[in-house]
Amino acid sequence: MEIPKLLYIAVIAIGLSGSLTCATPLANPWADPEAEANPEAKAIAEATAEAIAEALAEPEPALPALPLLAFLFSLPAVQHWIEKNWING
């Protein structure tokens, strides 16, 4: 059973946005309308969108690297969840 390429890319995008919001919660452009005017947050969002578009445009032989990237980008979110729920109570 093959896992769709789009699923890996979605995990990477969620991991990127999660690690950004965990590191700097006030720079979350989805929660704070004033943050949309922040050029740094806008540049990060554009770079993420561009990286996803490039990954979707690549041919399928690039697929073996996507599971590793998805795993690596999910680690900050997992670490944040563990710290929040287990360590800090």
Swiss-Prot record:
Q: What is the annotated signal peptide range for this record?
A: 1-23
List the propeptide residues: 24-61
**Cell location:** Secreted
Indicate where this protein is primarily found: secreted
Q: In which tissues is it expressed?
A: Expressed by the venom gland.
**GO terms, molecular function:** sodium channel regulator activity; toxin activity
Instruction: Describe its function.
Output: Vertebrate-selective toxin that causes pain by targeting voltage-gated sodium channels.
Recorded GO cellular component terms are: extracellular region
The protein's name in its UniProt record: Myrmicitoxin(1)-Pr2a
Does the record's keyword annotation contain Signal?
A: yes
List keywords of the entry alphabetically. Answer: Amidation, Ion channel impairing toxin, Neurotoxin, Secreted, Signal, Toxin, Voltage-gated sodium channel impairing toxin
Q: Which positions bear Asparagine amide?
A: 88
Species of the source: Pogonomyrmex rugosus
Identify its protein family. Belongs to the formicidae venom clade 1 family.
